[in-house]
Amino acid sequence: MQRSILAATALILTLTAPAPTHADPVPVGLDAYAQWDRWPQQRIGVRAYMRSTYDRDGGNRTADASHFLYAERPDFNVALDILGRGVLYFVRTNHWHGSPWHYEIDGTDNLVRETSTVDPERPVRNSTFEPATTFPPPLAWTWSTTRGADLNWVPIPFDRSLRLAYGRTFYGTGYYIYHQFAEGTPISTPLVPFDLTKPPDAKVLDLISRAGTDIAPQDIARHDTKATLTPGEPTTLFDHSAAATIRALKLTIPRDHARELSDARLRVTWDDRPSPSIDAPLALFFGAGLLHNRD
């Protein structure tokens, strides 16, 4: 069965774009957000890690909660312990569990709370992180907005070490993402240890607040195509043979076929390479499980 849609299951791009070199400074900290045009670039010398409170026995005991590395005292239960310089970019906890949290940077303890900490049995509506000016939306959201987790994307730089410890252990879950850097890797700004009194740059907050809006330039070349997809057969939507940068990829599909087209594969190939550099289900490419909009 054929369907006429503004979409494609395969894109073939012959694209020659300037490649980053080792001398290009790696955007770090808030620069990693502000320099959004460099998000797709491969970053040489960056080591990305994810850690959590998972059950080290592999059994998912207590739903991967409260598996701390060690405890120094009743209110200092260490879930993350890093040596060397780097940036902690993401922390997720179930609700406010574990608060107050100790962000120990280069040996200096910084205490971070959530407003439901005072009386955990009676959580606060419209809760926030404390200090609120240091952890504002949209870089930090609490369970009252997310309906399940406290999420923190405020970059936490450290020069020598970082430890994250929980003040309470009840259902102390946690997931953490951080970057470290190989010796000699140039970075965009010195890694000044995190300052609990310093709020994030307002320009970064404004940029992240515009997520989901169209921030692509309006005065650039466009290529519009209407394609008819045949199940099981690739369709070429765009083929370009000169140096260029793709600034936006927009697909419009029929609402009544959104679910089935979620699994259509999107393939993108640069410079006539034998294998595509992108080969993913359409929904996954756009960061969704399904293209179906329940609203």
Give the role of each language-model region.
Residues 1-4:
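Positively charged n-region of N-terminal signal peptides that target proteins for export
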Residues 7-16:
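Bacterial N-terminal signal peptides
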Residues 24-295:
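Beta-strand-centric surfaces of beta-sandwich/beta-rich domains
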Residues 19-22:
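Sec/Tat signal peptide C-region and signal peptidase I cleavage site
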